[in-house]
Swiss-Prot record:
Subunit text: Homodimer.
Protein name in the entry: Succinyl-diaminopimelate desuccinylase
Binding site for Zn(2+) 1: H68, D102, E165
Catalytic activity: N-succinyl-(2S,6S)-2,6-diaminopimelate + H2O = (2S,6S)-2,6-diaminopimelate + succinate
Cofactor: Zn(2+); Co(2+)
InterPro entries xref list: ArgE/DapE_CS, Bact_exopeptidase_dim_dom, DapE_proteobac, Peptidase_M20, Peptidase_M20_dimer, Peptidase_M20A
Family as reported in the entry's similarity comment: Belongs to the peptidase M20A family. DapE subfamily.
Keywords (A to Z) from UniProt: Amino-acid biosynthesis, Cobalt, Diaminopimelate biosynthesis, Hydrolase, Lysine biosynthesis, Metal-binding, Plasmid, Zinc
Record-linked HAMAP family: DapE (MF_01690)
Any single Pfam family the record assigns to this protein: Peptidase_M20
First-level EC class: hydrolase
Active-site annotation: D70, E136 (proton acceptor)
EC numbers for this chain: 3.5.1.18
Length: 378
């Protein structure tokens, strides 16, 4: 017989909610929350489903569980050992399915923990809340970001937030994320002069022109990081040039690169230093910048302490706080002045074919969430 958390996780996994489609996941969650007295607010924005739910009074702190019902595409179905939306638990106790780790397992654990908490502590202090979206794995324009804008506009208080991203690496709770690096992308267009390869003196080869500047960008020491963040990194992901002909010097080159930056650098400082390097090499260039998110950090305090002590109480393990990895919706919530911690299952197979987690980990995660609720709001 499956636990309540595993039953719900399987029900959610069986709904093929590839971004931005929700496939009824939120309806299921909202119905469960309504049954234990949560006030619900649906926020469909463009083609994205979102909801905000809360239980408790207007006074006191607010602890929010945040997450997403959408999943990434499955990839080739024939590569899966078990169909990705079957939610199958094998003989080794592994739960298979797209979203098992990222992050329908977390959603189930959050919801079951919250149900239990409001029944056990009906007069709890403050509020328990949920912020759920179907657009985290995609563009993320009309999901958490847009909901946060509405919450800010009406001066909604949000003290603490647990995001259910799969933070663990080997054992559930061994790692929590107490921040994330910022992400700044750029598309650089470098203009040269097209010509014949036999007459280079009549052309300007943008590939040759960029090479020394690119070498300098790659070797640049952007910052040294700090106690919470590694040094800022610069990575080139795409270089495109050429006409397709072997005897033509191209007239243009496009390079795509990305900064993952710490709190030791700013968007403006990075932009300025890139411009300085390009100008030093007398290049004819243009950059389109795209900021995906600013770095954020939750330092030791009420939320991080409660999560860490709950992990210790349930598992006997000391957790480690980390800011490594990619961006998450926590970056939007942190703009509210909220303490944000990410805690979820083991992330070894996220976004992969044959995504799976140890099924019993979800029951452990439920207990950790429940203990955290008690420590903060009971």
């Amino acid at each position: 017989m499956l636990s309540p958390t595993l039953e719900l996780a399987c029900d959610l996994i069986r709904r093929p909610s590839v971004t931005p489609v929700d496939a009824g996941c939120q309806e299921l969650m909202m119905a469960r929350l309504a049954n234990v007295g949560f006030a619900l607010e649906q926020m469909r924005i463009e083609n994205v489903d979102n909801f905000w739910a809360s239980h408790g009074g207007n006074d006191g702190p607010v602890l929010c569980f945040a997450g997403h019902t959408d999943v990434v595409p499955t990839g080739p179905l024939q590569a899966w050992n078990i169909p990705p939306f079957d939610a199958f638990i094998d003989d080794q106790g592994m739960l298979h399915g797209r979203g098992a780790a990222d992050m329908k397992g977390s959603l189930a654990a959050m919801l079951v923990a919250a149900e239990r908490f409001v029944v056990d502590y009906p007069d709890h202090r403050g509020s328990v809340a949920f912020l759920i979206t179907s657009d985290e794995e995609g563009p993320a324009h009309h999901g958490t970001k847009a909901v946060v804008e509405r919450l800010v506009a009406r001066q909604q208080r949000l003290d603490w937030c647990i995001v259910g991203e799969p933070s663990s690496t080997t054992l559930v709770g061994d790692i929590v994320k107490n921040g994330r690096r910022g992400s700044l992308g750029a598309t650089l267009t470098l203009r040269g002069v097209q010509g014949h390869v036999a007459y280079p003196h009549l052309a300007k080869n943008p590939i040759h022109l960029l090479a020394p500047a690119l070498a300098e960008l790659v070797s640049e020491h952007w910052d040294s990081g700090n106690a919470f963040f590694p040094p800022t990194s610069f990575q080139v992901s795409n270089l495109n040039s050429g006409t397709g002909a072997t005897n033509v010097i191209p007239g243009e080159l496009v390079a795509v690169f990305n900064f993952r930056f710490s709190t030791e650098s700013t968007v403006e400082s990075l932009k300025s230093r890139v411009a300085e390097i390009l100008d030093k090499h007398s290049l004819d260039w243009h950059i389109d910048w795209a900021l995906s998110g600013l770095p954020f950090l939750t330092e030791p305090g009420a939320l991080l302490d409660a999560v860490a002590s709950s992990i210790k109480a349930v598992t006997g393990r000391d957790t480690q706080a980390s800011t490594s990895g990619g961006t998450s919706d926590g970056r939007f919530i942190a703009t509210m002045g909220t303490q944000v911690v990410e805690l979820g299952p083991v992330n070894a197979t996220i976004h992969q074919v044959n995504e799976c987690i140890l099924a019993s980990d979800l029951d452990v995660l439920t207990e950790i969430y429940y203990e955290t609720l008690i420590k903060l709001l009971a």
